[in-house]
């Protein structure tokens, strides 16, 4: 479990989560895979504990959980979903799951400060050990079309160009937990992990975001 420093900055070290937390995480991963019936494809890439940014399309509140649960346990332990603080702190159960089980990196969408931008929070939160799960569309979409990517992914990679970027396409999640619904409907989904990309030296923001979005779109069509 990642332990923040007293000032809320970078982690002070990597500690194994308590047995209860590990068991809870394993059970939730099994439940998520059962409800989604998720099949997992790795296309020209393999699971790895190196630092990565998994960037995916976003249609459901369950996206982060299902993607996280699709990773092998050793990779999952080192991967932090980026999540909305207002949603995941609304209630004790959500807060416990986000902070203790998923080790989520919570972003405050209501009070963004210049010295504490979401990108800076992510940079501090991963240090030189953790990977991230992000959704560059910036919010959930209601259909199958992948929206234009927001600029956060570009600025994250500009500050950490060494990070390996893995495109991910999550299929059918908007039908498992439609927008506005509370209970999931058991259906089959597929999670496709694509080949890694990197921000190239001098690559313009618009070109990079278009290329990253295209990497996810190709997985959808494949």
Name each model-derived stretch:
Residues 5, 96, 131, 143-206:
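A cross-family acyltransferase "interaction/gating" segment
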Residues 20-21, 28-58:
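Helix-to-loop junction immediately C-terminal to a conserved catalytic motif
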Residues 50-51, 77, 128-130, 163:
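Short coil/turn segments at beta-strand junctions that form active-site/ligand-binding loops
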Residues 1-8:
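Soluble, non-transmembrane catalytic domains of enzymes that act on hydrophobic metabolites at membranes
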Residues 46, 62-63, 69, 114-147, ...:
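N-terminal/domain-start segments enriched in small and hydrophobic, helix-friendly residues
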Residues 84-88, 138, 170-174:
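Short beta-alpha junction loops
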Residues 46-111:
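Catalytic core of membrane glycerolipid acyltransferases/transacylases, capturing the structured
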């Amino acid at each position: 479990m990642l332990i923040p420093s007293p000032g809320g900055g970078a982690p002070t070290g990597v500690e194994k989560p308590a047995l209860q937390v590990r068991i809870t995480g394993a059970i939730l991963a099994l439940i998520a895979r059962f409800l989604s019936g998720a099949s997992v494809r790795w296309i020209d890439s393999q699971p790895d504990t190196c630092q990565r940014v998994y960037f995916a399309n976003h249609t459901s509140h369950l996206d982060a959980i299902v993607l996280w649960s699709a990773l092998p346990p050793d990779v999952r332990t080192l991967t932090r979903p980026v999540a909305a603080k207002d949603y995941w702190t609304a209630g004790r159960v959500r807060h416990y799951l986000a902070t203790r089980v998923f080790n989520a990196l919570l972003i405050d969408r209501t009070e963004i400060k210049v010295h504490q931008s979401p990108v800076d929070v992510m940079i501090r939160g991963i240090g030189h050990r953790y990977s991230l799960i992000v959704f560059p569309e910036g919010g959930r979409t209601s259909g199958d079309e992948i929206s234009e990517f927001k600029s956060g992914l570009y600025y994250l990679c500009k500050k950490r160009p060494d990070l390996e970027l893995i495109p991910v396409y999550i299929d059918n999640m908007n039908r498992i937990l439609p927008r506005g619904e509370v209970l999931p409907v058991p259906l089959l989904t597929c999670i496709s992990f694509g080949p890694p990309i990197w921000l190239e030296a001098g690559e313009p923001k618009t070109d990079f975001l278009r290329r990253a979005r295209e990497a996810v779109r190709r997985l959808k069509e494949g």
